């Protein structure tokens, strides 16, 4: 029903609760970028997209109200879309997303990109427009990404890769806890190492698995420096690449022509991610999700929405791969915060 509604632009349909849902603004993927977006670097260049093509990618930030409405589903704890903030956790009745399914969020926000005989879905948070300048921060765009990940169920051999902001900016929300593995790219410089140390310090209490990819490592001295400063967290290093340079010049080559040493580095990254599957802790993901929701609710969300957003927490709901796991009083058991127990 929802896929059909998306394909027929402009048509209105109702969900099971009788609410009328409309396609998000700009759902036509052929629409031109708005505001100042065309003046900013376009995403997708690393996948071989031409700048003009990349500039037409649909932005999740623009479609945030629609994303909220879809994910909200029939969750009785969420009174309206206006009551949802970027950290609102899923609960009974919420719609969950899967990597390999067709759903309205993917239909509206993902562009399929051909990759040497296969393809991948590419989504972008969205760039600043002229209307945003001076009055909004980029975290308002990233909120759509955080909601997406909070409602995502991914399984073995499924990958969602997020290119995050650099360094400490990642800690402006709970987004940094949404990953099985975080790869931090660091150059062999004091500044590169300091970003790593800062990130590791901020993440130390949240069980974040962190590995470092040494970038622009061209000399033995570069490798020795990173090993001395980073130690066992240094996973792989990459140096100069003619393949990458050609892509940056707008002449992308097939992925099969990537240098052997760089292909080996990427393979090692994938194996590192695959190894985390056995250690996946859905209860910890849910606990941290609720933890940051309560922090945001108390610091600004309650005042912004005029509601007690702690009441959105479903005390029996724990996210898991089946999408159906419920533990009676699960969050009361998992969370050691009195505010949560009182709210739910």
Regions found by a protein language model. Name each.
Residues 6:
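Hydrophobic anchor at the beta1->P-loop junction of P-loop NTPases
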Residues 14:
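Conserved lysine of the Walker
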Residues 10-11:
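Walker A (P-loop) phosphate-binding loop of P-loop NTPases
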Residues 24-118:
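N-terminal phosphate/diphosphate-binding loop that engages ATP/GTP or pyrophosphate donors
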Residues 135-256:
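Conserved catalytic-core segment of NTP-binding enzymes
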Residues 84-168:
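Phosphate-binding/switch loop-helix module in NTP-utilizing enzymes
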Residues 205-344:
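C-terminal lobe/tail of nucleotide-utilizing enzymes
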């Amino acid at each position: 029903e929802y896929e059909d509604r998306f394909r027929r632009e402009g048509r209105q349909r109702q969900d099971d609760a009788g609410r009328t849902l409309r396609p998000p603004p700009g759902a036509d993927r052929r629409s031109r970028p708005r505001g100042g977006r065309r003046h900013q670097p376009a995403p997708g260049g690393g996948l071989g997209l031409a700048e003009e093509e990349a500039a037409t990618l649909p932005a999740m930030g623009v479609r945030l109200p629609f994303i909220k409405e879809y994910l909200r589903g029939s969750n009785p704890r969420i009174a309206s879309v206006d009551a949802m903030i970027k950290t609102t956790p899923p609960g009974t009745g919420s719609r969950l997303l899967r990597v390999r399914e067709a759903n309205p969020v993917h239909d509206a926000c993902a562009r399929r990109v051909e990759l040497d005989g296969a393809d991948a879905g590419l989504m972008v948070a969205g760039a600043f427009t002229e209307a945003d300048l001076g009055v909004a921060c980029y975290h308002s765009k990233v909120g759509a990404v955080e909601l997406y990940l909070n409602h995502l169920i991914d399984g073995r051999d499924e990958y969602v890769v997020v290119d995050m902001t650099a360094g400490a900016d990642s800690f402006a929300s709970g987004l940094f806890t949404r990953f099985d593995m975080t790869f931090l790219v660091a150059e062999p410089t004091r500044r590169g190492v300091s970003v790593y140390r800062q990130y590791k310090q901020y993440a130390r209490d949240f069980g974040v698995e962190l590995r470092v990819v040494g970038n622009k490592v061209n000399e033995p001295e570069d490798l020795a420096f990173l090993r001395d400063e980073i130690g066992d967290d240094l996973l792989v290093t990459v140096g100069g690449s003619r393949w990458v340079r050609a892509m940056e010049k707008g002449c992308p080559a097939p992925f099969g022509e990537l240098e052997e040493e760089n292909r080996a580095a990427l393979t090692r990254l994938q194996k590192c991610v695959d190894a985390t599957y056995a250690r996946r802790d859905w209860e910890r993901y849910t606990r941290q999700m609720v933890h940051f929701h309560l922090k945001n609710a108390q610091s600004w969300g309650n005042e912004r929405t005029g509601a007690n957003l702690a009441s959105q927490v479903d005390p029996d709901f724990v996210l898991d791969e089946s999408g159906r796991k419920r533990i009676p009083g699960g969050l009361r058991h998992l969370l050691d915060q009195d505010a949560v127990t009182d709210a739910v």
